[in-house]
Amino acid sequence: MGSDALVLHDIDAFYGDSHVLHRVSLRLGEGRLLGLLGRNGAGKSTSMSVTVGLLPPRHGTIAVFGQAVTGRAPEGIAAQGVALVPQGRRIFKSLTVRENLAVAGRKPRTGGSTRWALDTIYELFPRIGERRRQIAGSLSGGEQQMLAIGRALMSNPRVLLMDEPSEGLAPLIVAEVMATIRRLKGQGLSIVLVEQNPKLVFQVADDIVILNSGRVVAEGPAAEFRDRDAELHQHLGIF
């Protein structure tokens, strides 16, 4: 522990002519959970797209465990141990649960912690195991989210990016998802959690970064934000 799992430094990103990220920097420590907060359109999901290579930055650098990955294709960044649970789940709805998981399988890197495979995913999410032969599109929203998380874990990542994992879920299912995140963190996985619900993030985060209009406007240990209510209200409209 103690090294940096993921570092974004001075990232500028554009959608066409629209400048959407302005010198964004964030640092995820190994085995830690970084909460990335901001209002709609603040740049949270864009930061995740840049990290996994879906949107190449025009300026700045990205490193995974000290290895530069700036400008690499998504496959190359995934090979370094980065996996994304995307907003909206984006499972393969015409495939079975098992097929969704199998297509994402990747051998774990040397020195990894948990070795994720079908049996360990089914142990983590028993309902997914019970429905392994079921077409994924017929699952409930909560089950689809579990499948999306399981699919990301099948790549045996060292860094897991989770973009709005509670979106559209009932409170009981949100509690299950958060319990899963705690378990993964407890196993030493390095996690970036993007959430619309800041109170969920503060339940599990070690560190916080707040974006506003594509810029980092606040950052620090999560515990420090307990006394920064005015700042949270200004940037997030809460507390």
Language-model features, listed with the residues they occupy:
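ABC-type ATPase nucleotide-binding domains, specifically the catalytic core motifs of the NBD
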Residues: 16, 72, 97-116, 124-129, ...
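The feature captures the beta-strand-to-loop junction immediately N-terminal to the Walker
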Residues: 37-39
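Helix-to-loop junction immediately C-terminal to a conserved catalytic motif
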Residues: 52
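Conserved ABC transporter NBD signature motif
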Residues: 60-69, 80, 114-118
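ABC ATPase C-loop
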Residues: 152-153
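Catalytic Walker B motif of ABC-type/P-loop ATPase nucleotide-binding domains
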Residues: 160-164
